[in-house]
Amino acid sequence: MNSEQLTEILKAAFPDAEVAVSGQAGKFDLRIVDNQFEGKRPVPRQQAVYAPLNSYIASGEVHAVTIRAMTKEEWRKASMFGA
């Protein structure tokens, strides 16, 4: 699994999202910016991101992920302050 493949999987699961993936060797940093996260706490957001990845995690193709799942407004604010 490479970052391009993972990006495509996440874009299919979150078609309206801005998706950014970096990493290699099974360890990836994920940023998914989508307003469907509005009103959701961090754990449900992470669960939504893990859902399309579970089979890849179970098979070992994806070993570890760091997830940043946020709304467009949260991303705008984070970008302004260098987060």
Swiss-Prot record:
Belongs to the BolA/IbaG family. InterPro entries: BolA (IPR002634), BolA-like_sf (IPR036065), BolA/IbaG_stress_morph_reg (IPR050961). This is Uncharacterized protein in rpoN-murA intergenic region.
